[in-house]
Amino acid sequence: MRPPRCLFPAAEILLKAPPSRRCMSSAAAFQPPKIVAAIPWKGSSFFLSNRLFDRSTCLDFVVLRRANGIRSTSASASTTHDSTLSSSPTANHSTSAHKDHKIAPHRKRQAQRREKAAAEAAAAAARGEKPLPPDASSLLAAHAASQTSPLRRHLSACLSLAKPRLTMLVVLTAMATYALYPVPEMLSPSTTETPSLSPLTLLFLTIGTTFCSASANALNMLYEPSTDAKMTRTRNRPLVRNLISKRAAVLFAILSGFVGTGALYFGVNPTVSGLGFANIVIYAGMYTPLKAVTAFNTWIGAVVGGIPPLMGWAAAAGETATKDGSWRELLFASDGSSIGGWVMAGLLFAWQFPHFMALSWPIREEYKKAGLRMLAWTNPARNGRVALRYSFVFIPLCLSLCAAGVTEWSFAVTSFPINAWLIRESVRFWRYEGNKGSARGLFWASVWHLPGVMILALLHKKGMWTRVWRSVFGEDEGEWEEEELDEMMSVAVANTNSHMQNQKTVR
């Protein structure tokens, strides 16, 4: 016969809890334990009523879990065991309910999305298809397909046309080069509040570069929807799935091009606007068609990757131009101040090869099936050699940044480990011909290499920490006067030399 159900399990189980072990003498160890009467705790009435926990049953879950571990030593062990077994289903139910209650709503949604993605992948595998890659364009295209509102569907499709991740990379390279431009002494904290260039120019540079990149990417998708449909990496693009019409895509590309070049022309300078327009033309008009003609298309695409650093450099140089501010002065300055921009462009040009060679290797058969000529399948041995060759270029390029006065010489030391890492992965990629995980290793090394080099260059920018020190602690007036006199003397000597050369030319 089972005992009657306990109305207040919390109080009863707490009284049944075994006493804690204490260090005691051998004599005290043999003394019988004292029996504590089942009376309410006196001290608890100072704060709240003894029956408050029992009425609210807030501790029943915790106490019942402890009850499963209690082993009674009294004569009524069987009775306690039966009562524990009778309460265990309730405890298990409470435990599962409590766990479900503890899961945050966003965690539940993430779990549901993972289950849905796994189900879709299993269904695609059952049909003999490969699951779609979870890149930004695929996710945006899937989001656009699920929208019921035509406006939201078109906005998501247009965002997918812009290739957000690639556009973000292009914009960041332009912004980093803009920030790396050496700030002249006339923009030092002695005359301005912060040792930086115009933030408004940076804003227009960011907006213009974003729209120019979006225009080029949209035109790229417009040109090759048939080849995109043959590749797992690109078959989920909006034009392949007919999520947006070609007319709307053309309109988006044209408007983005006009907005981007216009923002660069009126907000920055005409030279940067021309570079943005050249980026669109080379990427959409040369690189995209040549992908089906020759493997040399990779070099054309690398030129496109080197243009954004030139845009950032020309944008910064236009603010300190002393002459007419033409493209010759900004890109081919007679004093050699434009060398840093070309070195940064060369760095981005060289980075394209180890990155793309590693990226194209796992999907070389898909490129071949789509009719796109890439070195990964046309000449696999040369594919590894090209990646290795251009990975060695980064060491002299980093040294050139130091020699050009863009960064301190300490940058050559701090950038060496990350350059050595890229070289090591390129050697493995060339030696194993993309096998044994070498392609994946080189890909991730290239992914982390570019932001690492950029961040190190910004940290070692020439004179940056000196200007920060002066802006915080100030500088001596005599020191500033000496620097100003030295600068005036150097300018006077340069003007005198140029005047003498002009007179010799006239004679």
From Swiss-Prot:
The enzyme's E.C. designation:
2.5.1.141
Compositionally biased tracts (Low complexity):
72-90
Its recorded reaction(s) are: heme b + (2E,6E)-farnesyl diphosphate + H2O = Fe(II)-heme o + diphosphate
- Please give the chief subcellular localization of this protein: mitochondrion
CDD domains for this protein: PT_UbiA_Cox10
Residue ranges with Basic residues bias: 99-111
Superkingdom to which the source organism belongs: Eukaryota
* Transmembrane residue ranges: 166-186, 199-219, 248-268, 270-290, 298-318, 339-359, 392-412, 441-461
Q: Where in the cell is it found?
A: Mitochondrion membrane
Gene Ontology cellular-component annotations: mitochondrial membrane
For the keyword Transit peptide, the answer is yes
The GO terms describing molecular function are: protoheme IX farnesyltransferase activity
What Pfam family is a match, any one? UbiA
What processes in GO biological process is this protein linked to?
A: heme A biosynthetic process
InterPro entries named among the record's database cross-references:
Protohaem_IX_farnesylTrfase, Protohaem_IX_farnesylTrfase_mt, UbiA_prenyltransferase, UbiA_prenylTrfase_CS, UbiA_sf
Please report the record's description of how this protein sits within the membrane.
Answer: Multi-pass membrane protein
Q: Where is this region: Disordered?
A: 72-136
Task performed by this protein = Converts protoheme IX and farnesyl diphosphate to heme O.
Record family assignment: Belongs to the UbiA prenyltransferase family.
PANTHER family (alphabetical): PROTOHEME IX FARNESYLTRANSFERASE, MITOCHONDRIAL (PTHR43448:SF2)
Q: Which NCBIfam families match?
A: cyoE_ctaB
Task: Write down what this protein is called.
Answer: Protoheme IX farnesyltransferase, mitochondrial
Q: Name its species.
A: Gibberella zeae (strain ATCC MYA-4620 / CBS 123657 / FGSC 9075 / NRRL 31084 / PH-1) (Wheat head blight fungus)
